[in-house]
Structures are given as C-alpha cells and as structure tokens.
C-alpha cells in the first residue's frame, strides 16, 4: 500500500524480474522459507497449472516479514511464522530453533544479501535451496537514462541492494540527494559506497514513504 499523503513520487524501475520454474520433488519437505514476495510471485507464475503449487500451499511457510507473509496468505499458503525484526540476520536466528528436525526448502533469489543459507548449514539444518527468481539489470539507452535521472534534492528510497546497485550503475548519487534504506543490508551496502542513508522503523515501503514525508516536512 502506498501512502496517499506523499505526492508526487515516482517508481524508478531499473531491474526486471526473471522467474525460474521449481524442478525439485517436494515430497521430502515439511517447511518452506520465504524472504521475499518475489519468490511467491515466481511460484504463482511458473506453477499455476501444476499440482506442485497446491503441495507448496500446504507446507508450513516461514516468512521474513509481514509483507511477505501477507502475500503468502493472500495466495492460500500456510504461514507458520513471521519474522519480528524482518532483517535477514535476525530472522535466521529466530527460525533456527523452529527448524530443528525439519526438512526445509529455501526459495530464494539468484543473488542474496544475507548469509541465511550459510548460517542454516553451520547449524546443521537439513535444507535445500531453490533459485526461483533473479533481478536482472535493465538496459537503458543514454536518452532513457537522461529522462529517468532523479531531479536535484530528490529523496530516493532503496528497497533492495539490487536496486541500489542498479541506480549506481546508471546514475551518480548527488550530494543533495537524500537516501532511505528499507533494511540494514541495503543501508550497509550504500554506506560502503560512501552514501549515508536513513532507515525506516519497519522494513516496508509504507514506512519508507512515511519517513520520506517527515524528512520533507523538516526541510520546509
């Protein structure tokens, strides 16, 4: 949901999603891990005519955040747990004791920011990973880049490391830009690029938009 009190704002799309079909036999699994809504959308798209989708919907799902959990619930998945912190490192610590003696399937992107997989392995969790989507950089011509470049004094919201990488691939981060990160890993990535960012109270787009509004009010 977008805040209706914030105007004008634009969505700058620099990546495109590529979905990959799930090829695994689902019989062994009795727990699913979702850290992104995109993994859910990939399953809905690639398995819409397959009995595998119904099987997945009946396996308890462990969701990183409220938005991911809501997407799962809206599409009839069985949500067993929702992360309280909604950040990768904290989430894996929350679910470790819940996943003991379970056979886990982690549905993920091709590139991930957290070390969730390594931590599960380190703690002896019986799990497999399936790459079900990828964030691909869109090709932009020079004229498209010029047309899309944010104006000076813009507030920029970065909802993933992949979005920050894409932005910096095409644009310079001006000194008078203000950056907002949706989560800790995105903020850390920006910091490594020499960009300080504000972090929203919750890792959601709505919280980021509310923060953007409060920053604008302070400037006035």
Question: What is the meaning of each model-derived region?
Answer:
Residues 1-220:
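Signature of uroporphyrinogen-III synthase
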């Amino acid at each position: 949901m977008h805040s209706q009190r914030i105007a004008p704002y634009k969505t700058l799309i620099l990546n495109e999603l590529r979905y990959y079909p799930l090829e695994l036999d689902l019989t062994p699994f009795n727990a699913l891990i979702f850290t992104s809504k995109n993994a859910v959308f990939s399953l809905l798209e690639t398995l819409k005519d397959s009995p595998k989708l119904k099987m997945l919907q009946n396996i308890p799902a462990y969701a990183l955040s409220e938005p991911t959990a809501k997407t799962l619930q809206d599409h009839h998945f069985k949500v067993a747990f929702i992360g309280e912190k909604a950040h990768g490192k904290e989430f894996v610590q929350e679910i470790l004791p819940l996943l003991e003696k379970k056979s886990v399937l982690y549905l993920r992107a091709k590139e991930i920011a957290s070390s969730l997989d390594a931590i599960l392995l380190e703690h002896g969790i019986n799990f497999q990973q399936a790459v079900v989507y990828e964030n691909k950089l869109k090709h932009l011509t020079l004229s498209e880049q010029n047309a899309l470049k944010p104006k000076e004094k813009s507030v920029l919201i970065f909802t993933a490391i992949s979005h920050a990488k894409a932005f910096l691939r095409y644009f310079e981060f001006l000194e008078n830009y203000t950056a907002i990160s949706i989560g800790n890993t995105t903020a850390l990535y920006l910091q490594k690029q020499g960009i300080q960012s504000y972090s929203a109270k919750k890792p959601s787009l709505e919280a980021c938009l509310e923060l953007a509004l409060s920053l604008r009010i302070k400037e006035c």
